């Protein structure tokens, strides 16, 4: 039976005049349709993901296609059981993705070669190729292409500095890069070319498109794909499922993401339900004892109950440390 909701993912680098006005108008339109999601608009284009019913998303896609700026924009469609977002945000930004460059890259003028899923699959098996994950560390940790390089970064804007510090792994190689939907690689691959790397290619349509391709069927992808909505992760490889994620607390195989219960921290952690409850969904002692701890509030734990759990954790840590 066909699911009644969809999640759309899309981007287009295209000049947008008066992006502030367009942002306000687009927010009103999305709310009128009843969509939920997050959309960024800048003078360089649009980058969005929204959820809604089949009827709502059909109307939205029709409206986008009627706008000459977005008529050729590919839209990735996932079936869903319900909304994947809690609110509808359309925000104006100076740039669609932030590399924090003094001299920004325009993907319409400079970007890496686009490879289809089949081409990417074949190329990444070549010994003279290096595959760079253009996403953040927590995205990589729950799933990635087999053999891909994991930049030690928490945000996209840290990537250029990391590349400069580790350029020896790229020199003399054919470079492949990938991200969730493709929007980050458009700019990142262009930056790589400007830095002097000659053979630079990107996965057209990103991981999401790769996982839906009928020929490659997500092969050579291990784990799940992190997504920025309430689903948190989605499957990619249709032929085998290799778990690469590890529980933050125990190191055991796991693919379940939670956020640290201390809102001042909000760290993304992979954790089983057992670990979540045992450690009060908190990444550290400081977060567990924070006055703002949401886990404590959500489960109505008394001070005595909190202290009991802290004592158990402390005792186990003392034993493990010998």
UniProtKB/Swiss-Prot annotation:
Entries under InterPro entries matching the protein: Rhodanese-like_dom (IPR001763), Rhodanese-like_dom_sf (IPR036873), Rhodanese_C (IPR022111), TrhO (IPR020936), TRHO_N (IPR040503)
Sample GO molecular function, one term: oxidoreductase activity, acting on paired donors, with incorporation or reduction of molecular oxygen
EC number: 1.14.-.-
GO biological process, one term: tRNA modification
Source organism, top-level taxon: Bacteria
Catalysed reaction equations from the record: uridine(34) in tRNA + AH2 + O2 = 5-hydroxyuridine(34) in tRNA + A + H2O
Family matches, as SMART domains: RHOD (SM00450)
Rhodanese domain mapped to chain residues: 125-219
Alphabetized PROSITE patterns for the sequence: RHODANESE_3 (PS50206)
Enzyme class: oxidoreductase
Active site, UniProt feature: 179
Transmembrane segments: none
Keywords: Oxidoreductase, tRNA processing
Pfam families linked: Rhodanese, Rhodanese_C, UPF0176_N
Role noted for this protein: Catalyzes oxygen-dependent 5-hydroxyuridine (ho5U) modification at position 34 in tRNAs.
UniProt similarity note: Belongs to the TrhO family.
The protein, known as: tRNA uridine(34) hydroxylase
Species of provenance: Bacillus pumilus (strain SAFR-032)
């Amino acid at each position: 039976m066909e699911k009644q909701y969809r999640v759309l993912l899309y981007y287009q680098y295209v000049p947008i005049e008066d992006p502030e006005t367009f942002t306000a108008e687009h927010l009103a339109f999305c709310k009128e349709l009843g969509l939920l999601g997050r959309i960024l608009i800048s003078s360089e284009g649009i980058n969005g993901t929204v959820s809604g019913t089949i009827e709502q998303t059909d109307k939205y896609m029709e409206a986008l296609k009627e706008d000459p700026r977005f008529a050729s924009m590919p839209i990735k469609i996932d079936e869903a059981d319900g909304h994947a977002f809690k609110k509808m945000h359309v925000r104006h930004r100076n740039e669609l993705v932030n590399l924090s460059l003094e001299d920004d890259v325009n993907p319409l003028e400079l970007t890496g070669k686009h490879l289809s899923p089949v081409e990417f699959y074949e190329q990444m098996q070549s010994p003279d190729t290096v595959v760079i994950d253009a996403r953040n560390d927590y995205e990589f940790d729950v799933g990635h292409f087999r053999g891909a390089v994991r930049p030690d970064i928490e945000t996209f804007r840290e990537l250029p500095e990391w590349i400069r510090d580790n350029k020896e792994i790229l020199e003399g190689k054919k470079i492949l890069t990938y991200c969730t939907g493709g929007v980050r690689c458009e700019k990142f691959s262009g930056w790589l070319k400007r830095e002097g790397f000659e053979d630079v290619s990107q996965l057209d349509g990103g991981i999401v498109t790769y996982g839906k391709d009928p020929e490659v069927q997500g092969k050579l992808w291990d784990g799940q794909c992190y997504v920025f909505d309430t689903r948190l992760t989605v499957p990619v490889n249709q032929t085998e499922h290799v778990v690469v994620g590890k529980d933050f607390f125990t190191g055991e195989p796991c693919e379940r993401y939670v956020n640290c219960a201390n809102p001042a921290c909000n760290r993304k952690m992979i954790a089983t339900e057992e670990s979540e409850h045992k450690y009060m969904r908190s990444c550290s002692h400081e977060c567990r004892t924070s006055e703002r701890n949401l886990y404590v509030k959500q489960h109505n734990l008394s001070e005595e109950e909190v202290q009991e759990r802290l004592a158990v954790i402390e005792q186990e840590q003392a034993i493990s440390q010998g």
